[in-house]
Amino acid sequence: KVQLLFICLMLSAAAFAADKVVKLPKPNLNRTGTVMKALSERQSTREYASKALTLADLSDLLWAANGINRSDAGKRTAPSALNKQDVDVYVILPEGSYLYDAKNHQLNLIAEGDYRGAVAGGQAFVKTAPVSLVLISDVSRFGDAQKTQNQLMGAMDAGIVSQNISVFCSAAKLATVPRASMDAAQLKKVLKLKDSQIPMLNH
């Protein structure tokens, strides 16, 4: 089986159980593989092995998703409309939910407890995935959060981050599937989101 990504990152529980901040190792910018090969092998997968993902792989995955690749300007691997960097990546683990802090390349604890069921929505196979990534767009970074155009830009930006995740997972031989199904209301409560922060997609 392909190593779980669902992102099936089972990073040993010990790595997260007691830490409110998890420092990630520096991303490996010299990983093997080509973009063309990754695109040719990209696929959505809903069956996962339970083998743990290393902290190094999680680090590379999050950096590829929406990390900072130009530190002098603070710009990201994923472009965003007007460079507003509206998409935040939340890491949902059995032990708790974390926000990926791209600037410091670390995970910050948001809520303790298992909220994988909120990510699953109506799809039960997600509930047992060791980890999911939830993509949240804060459309207020564009101005009026109620403006349709701003919400569309947020959805577009989340889609770009999602594609980065899919391509990285293909190259790294990790299984994943992009999803829009989730219990958005519960996630907004658990993750302490503002009204302007919209759950767009998850993996």
Q: Predicted segment positions?
A:
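N-terminal amphipathic, basic helical "cap/leader" segment at the start of enzyme domains
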Residues: 18-129
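Short, surface-exposed helix-loop/turn micro-motifs enriched in polar/charged residues
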Residues: 81, 176-179, 195
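Bacterial N-terminal signal peptides
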Residues: 5-13
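A short, structure-level motif marking secondary-structure boundaries and short turns
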Residues: 20-21, 149-151, 200
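Small-aliphatic-rich amphipathic alpha-helix that forms the alpha element of a beta-alpha
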Residues: 42, 61, 89, 131-142, ...
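A glycine-rich helix N-cap at a beta->alpha junction
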Residues: 192-203
